[in-house]
Curated annotation (Swiss-Prot):
This is Small ribosomal subunit protein mS29. The lineage of its organism: Eukaryota, Fungi, Dikarya, Ascomycota, Saccharomycotina. Its main location: mitochondrion. Residues 21-40 are annotated as: Disordered. SUPFAM superfamilies: P-loop containing nucleoside triphosphate hydrolases. It is found in: Mitochondrion. Pfam families: DAP3. Component of the mitochondrial small ribosomal subunit (mt-SSU). Mature yeast 74S mitochondrial ribosomes consist of a small (37S) and a large (54S) subunit. The 37S small subunit contains a 15S ribosomal RNA (15S mt-rRNA) and 34 different proteins. The 54S large subunit contains a 21S rRNA (21S mt-rRNA) and 46 different proteins. Residues 1-14 form a transit peptide.
Length: 450
């Protein structure tokens, strides 16, 4: 009995003694106790990478896009793209006019992954089966609503830029949404507009309105008079203190004045609606509404934005999503009969069954989830009678024309020029490009060596 009590006592003493030994020593007087830091001559935080003229501090695509590499490109005299005289430039590499370049740059028609830095300015090949065929359909088709399809890298964005150039020459007003992901990815400010009953994105709308203003001819915008009066709060820092509101009169002001309004963010949704309303009711000037990377919309029924219940916001509850689909479906109609709507899908986006069902290529599967199929989008596309135009691959004659231009631009390697017969080189590059894919053709020429 005594031995058992002693063992318990000793165990208790050992337990309490162990706790006292493990306890940290009190901090010296005048110092606060904290976590110990490892003494090291090297800081735990890596220093910022030093940016020098020769360093690669961006990824490859952004570096080549912004490094001004086109300044060292070989200047070549090329014919100018002109649809009215397209027979003279068929199957030839052409450049754009200065007016076209200015508009297309503002519209965002040229993308980073197109290797435009290899040449002084972006160029294109005028193709019989793509450029000429599509623009002829655009002019003659009774319902001018098209969706451009094709495999990745086949030239869908290039064809869309050629349509933009045609619109510039034919004096049309162009509205282009180059990256729908920018209003779907949840990275813009947004708020709910009680009057519109939609979620608006003020900063995105500000950039889009500026794009429309800068990309189009001021004389065209000025020629369209307003159909009614408007009043917006004034956010112009120059005179906002003495002029709290901007008033536009239908007898004095034009669409150019409407696009130039500087208003507060909460009113920007109403400003965008007013712009679309004015462009749709007028019949003087044709409107070309285009969307590149439209496959992002078709595969993103729910945006990355969330409402007050922490639920993802449906794409058609965003002002931009509804505005776009209203134009496509015909809910918003442009009064001018020459107006058109052109969509283009992208190979960088995932695919689902929405577009094939809308085009009648496959039947509806009632058991598929909304991740793979969005019935509302199918309904709107079919309501708008959207016609598919599939961009074909290059034929050998077009590959020959492109490689000849690349040779003149000093893009070809010396081993390709001197070590092979020209016919063998064409056959080889045609095969390496996947039987005529323009992007893969250029990759096989410029990215095939170390």
């Amino acid at each position: 009995m005594l031995r058992m009590s002693t063992s318990r006592f000793i165990g208790q003493r050992l337990f309490t003694t162990a706790r006292s030994l493990q306890a940290a020593k009190p901090a010296p007087k005048g110092k606060t106790q904290g976590f110990s830091k490892k003494s090291s001559s090297v800081s735990s935080y890596s220093s910022a990478k030093r940016v020098t003229p020769g360093s690669l501090y961006k990824n490859w695509t952004n570096t080549t896009h912004t490094a001004q590499l086109q300044q060292t490109a070989v200047p070549l005299a090329l014919p100018i793209f002109n649809f009215d005289d397209i027979s003279k430039t068929l199957n030839k590499v052409v450049s754009y006019s200065n007016k076209q370049y200015k508009s297309l740059h503002h519209l965002g028609s040229f993308k980073k992954s197109q290797f435009n830095e290899l040449f002084q300015k972006p160029v294109c090949l005028v193709r019989e089966d793509a450029t000429n065929s599509f623009l002829k359909k655009l002019v003659s088709h009774p319902v001018k609503k098209f969706i451009i399809t094709g495999e990745p890298g086949v030239g869908k964005t290039v064809l869309l830029s050629q349509a933009h150039a045609y619109a510039v020459d034919s004096k049309q007003i162009i509205i282009n949404i180059s990256y729908p992901e920018l209003f779907l990815n949840g990275r813009n400010d947004f708020s709910y507009d009680d009057d519109l009953k939609l979620f608006i994105q003020p900063m995105y709308l500000k950039k889009l309105i500026r794009k429309i203003l800068k990309a189009n001819d001021p004389a065209l915008l000025k020629s369209i008079e307003l159909s009614k009066d408007y009043k917006f709060s004034n956010a112009n820092p120059k005179n906002a203190s003495v002029k709290p509101f901007v008033t536009l009169n239908k007898t004095k002001n034009t669409v150019l004045d409407l696009l130039s309004v500087m208003t507060h963010p909460h009113n920007r949704g109403k400003l965008m609606k007013a712009i679309i309303d004015e462009l749709s009711v007028q019949s003087k000037v044709p409107i070309m509404f285009t969307v590149d990377n439209f496959s992002k919309v078709l595969t993103t029924a729910y945006s990355a934005y969330r409402n007050t219940e922490n639920k993802q916001i449906y794409s058609l509850d965003l002002q931009m999503g509804k505005l776009m689909m209203d134009i496509i479906s015909g809910e918003t109609k442009f009064a001018n009969g020459e107006s058109s709507t052109i969509l283009a899908i992208s190979g960088v986006d995932r695919t689902n069954k929405t577009l094939p069902v809308a085009l009648g290529k496959i039947p509806v599967d009632p058991y598929v989830t909304r991740y793979h199929y969005e019935p509302k989008f199918v309904e709107l596309l079919q309501k708008g009678n959207v016609t598919e135009f599939e961009v074909p691959k290059l034929n050998k004659q077009e590959v020959n024309e492109l490689i000849d231009y690349y040779k003149q631009s000093n893009v070809l390697l010396d081993k390709d020029i001197t070590g092979k017969k020209w016919e063998n080189l064409i056959d080889e590059k045609y095969f390496l490009s996947g039987n005529g894919n323009p992007r893969e053709l250029l990759k096989s020429l410029v990215l095939s060596h170390r």
